[in-house]
């Protein structure tokens, strides 16, 4: 019935399609007091026995000014419980419910034991409270259910959980208040263990446009056997504005997921979470057994101490902003120990005066994180403080690093390309080989314990559909990222030893073959450059074969002996 409002978005006054006002619609619902029973719990159970689809609960004035008390009410079908709203946070007016003393929960929407899964139902326009501020258990439980909704409600005043979800799908929790909840054994919303199989989980759940405040424990969290999947946590407010009756006894995180997969945590506001404020050491923690992709994007982490800890999962973090006073007091970036690919961009720090004190990370043009490339072997990703984007691949000996497709534009028979790889050896004996199919094009010995750039050139006639890098050595390689692209020139640097030249004498450098590097694509060469003075010498480049090689000639054109000190020569070979 309440889905049929003909009401413009944002309006507080509306009518049904049949012309009735909202108040008339509410008054036409079956009222709690119309059912038999001596207590509110008894009356609601009587309504459930009759199978009514909706029950309206009026303001506390109809109950002598006291909250309606409910305890351990099991709801086995899609019942809608509708209130008339409430006034104020610590309410005394409106539809106010309270869990009965000694109860484990207030309401349990459960499809267990049903021939068919319940679809629909939920809570609307109600203020729901625990029996005491230190009571444990749950206010609401939902099990084996689809299309559950909790809209425009408040969940408050208990050390247990506001909402516990188990095997709940296609559901929505939006426009609610979660406040004065949680403790060492509680929190706001919990994704509980799977019911029987891993697919009996919480999935396709939207938690949107809610306000969370004054809580302990995880404000949203999951257990180690929960497997939540396809979760939206969007446009919520998470604000620390005090500690509830049951404070945290261990370091805690606002969003704390032991397991999570395919999640969108976006456009939320987090405020004032620090160790000094109820031991909130970070905003987000993802456990080591998390497996799927989690996007943490475009959130405002104002006056927060730390972004959090990523121990598992494939986490993408970008567009997040902090507002600390300076770079030295800016938010601590994510700690990443996940063995899976994570791409964690810096949380930007913008001071109150508008100055950016911690900005975006600048990456080289065309830079690709190695872990983002495809491959034929699952490789562990690990944290390295000196990694370009913190996640690097550990590649065992005799294993493919990654492979990539060559752009068709480069396969014109004319283009020479360059691969620059940032890598380090875990120990001596690491070797990187660039291959086209099974053909080895070039190899590089990788120094142990130090990050360096290693450059490979690929001739035009070597560019096949794909290229690959392999560790062909005997030690692990840590591979960070690479840049692959067309080159216009190659700087050719080599050792020379002209020594002392008599008057009129010439020195010819060792032969330099560019055939294996650039093929026959060299169009021109530059004037040779040296690492010392060449006063009195004539220098030039001579081609030495039709297959692509050259020497540099140095001639003493003076009338006396010349002592040279140069030891290296560089020639730029233009290939485009």
Swiss-Prot record:
Changing residue 167 to N: 8 times decreased enzymatic activity. GO terms for biological process: adhesion receptor-mediated virion attachment to host cell; symbiont entry into host cell via disruption of host cell envelope; symbiont entry into host cell via disruption of host cell glycocalyx. Residues 488-576 are annotated as: Lectin-like. It comes from the Viruses. Residues 380-487 are annotated as: Carbohydrate binding. The active site is at 170, 229, 239, 241. Keywords: Degradation of host capsule during virus entry, Degradation of host cell envelope components during virus entry, Host-virus interaction, Viral attachment to host adhesion receptor, Viral attachment to host cell, Viral tail protein, Virion, Virus entry into host cell. It is found in: Virion. GO terms for cellular component: virus tail. Changing residue 239 to Q: 2000 times decreased enzymatic activity. Residues 34-360 are annotated as: Catalytic. Gene3D superfamilies: Single-stranded right-handed beta-helix, Pectin lyase-like (2.160.20.10). In the N-terminal section; belongs to the Przondovirus depolymerase 2 family. In the C-terminal section; belongs to the K21-specific depolymerase family. Homotrimer. The 3 parallel chains are tightly packed together to form an elongated structure of approximately 7 x 12 nm. Interacts (via N-terminus) with depolymerase 1 (via N-terminus); this interaction probably gives rise to a branched tailspike. Functions as a receptor binding protein (RBP) and probably mediates the attachment to the host capsular exopolysaccharides. Displays a depolymerase activity that specifically degrades the K21-type polysaccharides Klebsiella pneumoniae capsule, which allows the phage to reach the host cell membrane and bind the entry receptor. Consists in a catalytic region, a carbohydrate binding region and a lectin-like region. The active site consists of catalytic dyads Asp-Glu located at the interface between 2 adjacent subunits. The lectin-like region is probably involved in trimerization. This is Depolymerase 2, capsule K21-specific. It comes from Klebsiella phage KP32. The gene is 38.
């Amino acid at each position: 019935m309440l889905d049929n409002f003909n009401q413009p978005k944002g309006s507080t006054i509306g009518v049904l399609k049949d012309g009735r006002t909202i108040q008339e619609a509410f008054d036409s619902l079956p009222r709690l007091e119309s059912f038999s029973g001596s207590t509110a719990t008894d009356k609601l159970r009587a309504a459930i026995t009759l199978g009514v689809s909706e029950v309206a609960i009026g303001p506390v004035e109809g109950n002598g000014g006291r909250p309606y008390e409910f305890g351990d009410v099991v709801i086995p079908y899609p019942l809608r419980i509708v209130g008339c709203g409430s006034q104020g946070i610590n309410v005394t007016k409106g539809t106010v419910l309270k869990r009965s003393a000694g109860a484990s929960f207030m309401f349990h929407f459960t499809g267990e034991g049903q021939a068919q899964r319940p679809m629909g139902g939920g809570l609307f326009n109600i203020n729901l409270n625990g029996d005491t501020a230190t009571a444990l258990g749950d206010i609401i439980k939902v099990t084996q259910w689809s299309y559950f909704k909790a809209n425009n409600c408040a969940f408050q005043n208990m050390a247990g959980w506001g909402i516990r979800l188990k095997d709940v799908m296609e559901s929505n929790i939006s426009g609610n208040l979660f406040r004065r909840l949680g403790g060492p054994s509680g929190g706001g919303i919990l994704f509980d263990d799977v019911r029987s199989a891993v697919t009996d989980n919480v999935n396709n759940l939207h938690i949107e446009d809610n306000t969370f405040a004054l809580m302990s424990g995880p404000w949203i969290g999951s257990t180690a056997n929960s497997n939540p999947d396809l979760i939206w946590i969007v446009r919520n407010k998470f604000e620390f504005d005090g500690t509830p009756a049951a404070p945290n006894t261990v370091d805690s995180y606002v969003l704390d997921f032991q397991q999570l997969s395919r999640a969108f945590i976006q456009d939320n506001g987090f405020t004032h979470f620090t160790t000094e404020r109820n031991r909130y050491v970070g905003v987000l923690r993802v456990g080591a057994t998390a497996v799927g992709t989690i996007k943490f994007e475009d959130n405002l982490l104002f006056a927060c101490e730390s972004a959090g800890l990523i121990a598992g999962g494939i986490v993408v973090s970008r567009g997040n902003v902090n507002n600390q006073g300076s770079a030295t007091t800016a938010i601590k970036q994510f700690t990443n120990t996940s063995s899976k690919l994570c791409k964690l961009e810096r949380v930007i720090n913008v001071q109150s005066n508008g100055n950016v004190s911690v900005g975006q990370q600048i990456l080289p043009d065309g830079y690709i994180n190695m872990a983002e490339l495809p491959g034929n072997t699952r490789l562990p990703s690990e944290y390295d403080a000196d990694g370009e984007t913190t996640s690097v691949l550990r590649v065992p000996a005799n294993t493919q690093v990654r492979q990539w497709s060559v752009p068709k534009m480069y396969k014109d028979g004319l283009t020479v390309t360059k691969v620059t790889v940032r890598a380090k050896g875990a120990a001596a004996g690491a070797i990187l080989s660039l291959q086209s199919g099974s053909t080895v094009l070039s190899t590089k010995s990788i120094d142990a314990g130090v990050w360096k750039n290693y450059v490979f050139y690929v001739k035009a006639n070597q560019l096949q559909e794909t290229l690959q890098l392999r560790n062909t050595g005997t030690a692990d390689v840590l591979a960070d990222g690479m840049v692959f692209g067309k080159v216009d020139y190659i700087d050719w640097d080599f050792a020379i030893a002209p020594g002392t030249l008599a008057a009129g004498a010439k020195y010819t450098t060792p032969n330099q073959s560019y055939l294996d590097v650039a093929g026959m694509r060299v169009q021109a060469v530059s004037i040779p450059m040296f690492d010392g003075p060449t006063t009195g010498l004539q220098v030039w480049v001579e081609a030495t074969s039709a297959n692509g090689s050259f020497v540099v000639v140095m001639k003493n054109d003076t009338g006396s002996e010349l002592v040279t000190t140069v030891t290296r020569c560089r020639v730029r070979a233009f290939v485009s």
